Structures are given as C-alpha cells and as structure tokens.
C-alpha cells in the first residue's frame, strides 16, 4: 500500500513539475536515482541556460547541488537538433559536457546560421570560446570556423 501511494505521489509530482523541467519526453522518461541519470525517449527536449536540444532519445547524467539537479553530461541519439543563439546544429549523435561546455556532434553534421550552411562528419562546438571545428567527410580534413559575435556577414 505504501508503494502505491509513493507511485501516485511521484506521478503527481512529476506531472506538476513537467512544464518547468529542463527535460521533456514524448514517450518515456526513466529516472535512475541510484546512478543519477535520466533516460528519455520520443520527442525529447533538453534546455539549459545556453541552448535547447531535441532528439529521439537522450541519456542525461546529473549531480545534486543545493537540492537541485545539475546536468553534467547529456547524450543525444538520432535526429539531433541543437539551437544555440542564431545557429542550429544537426547530427545523428551528440554529447554535451558541462565541465568544458563543449558539444560534439557526429554523423551527417550541419551548422546553419542566417548567412551560411556548413556540412561535415563531425562538429565540435566550444560554446564558451565561440569556436567551431568541423571535420569534413575525410577524417584527415579539418575546417575551423570562427564566428564573431558582432559579425554582420
């Protein structure tokens, strides 16, 4: 009986907090408190103070700090789309690490901005330093793109 009330309370709490949550899922959202992680499936959305990410599946690891969950690593799978300021990053797989504030995308990667579209195999986006490294289809060919915050073109 206690388990029943615990499940009802948990579902009520999750439904009330869902709108304010940085993490949303269309099909399932599994919380693993022991391993401090979430697994989300179906129309996944993740938001933080830097970007918004969408994918078919996501695994997010977190730490608890002052009674809040701080997401440290977010891994996105299939149909990945990341909106950052005026840029949109797309790929098949992405991993974000909070410690260095870097997003790494792989597989049919693109960077789209109001003035350009770049494509390649791998993208490393350094959010703090406003730097993008795009690896083309050839593993040995690298293209580095520096974006100026005040650039008009």
Pin down the residues of each PLM region.
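Mature-chain termini and adjacent capping regions
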Residues: 1-153
């Amino acid at each position: 009986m206690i388990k029943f009330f615990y499940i009802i309370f948990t579902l009520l709490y999750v439904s009330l907090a869902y709108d304010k949550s940085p993490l949303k899922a269309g099909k399932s959202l599994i919380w693993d408190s022991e391993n401090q992680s979430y697994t989300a499936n179906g129309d996944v959305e993740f938001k933080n103070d830097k970007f918004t990410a969408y994918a078919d599946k996501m695994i997010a690891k977190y730490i608890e700090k002052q009674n809040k969950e701080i997401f440290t690593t977010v891994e996105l799978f299939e149909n990945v789309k990341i909106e950052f300021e005026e840029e949109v990053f797309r790929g098949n797989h992405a991993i974000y690490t909070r410690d260095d504030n870097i997003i790494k995308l792989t597989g049919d990667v693109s960077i789209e901005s109001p003035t350009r579209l770049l494509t390649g195999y791998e993208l490393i986006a350094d959010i703090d330093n406003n730097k993008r490294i795009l690896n083309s289809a050839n593993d040995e060919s690298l293209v580095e793109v520096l974006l100026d915050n005040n650039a008009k073109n």
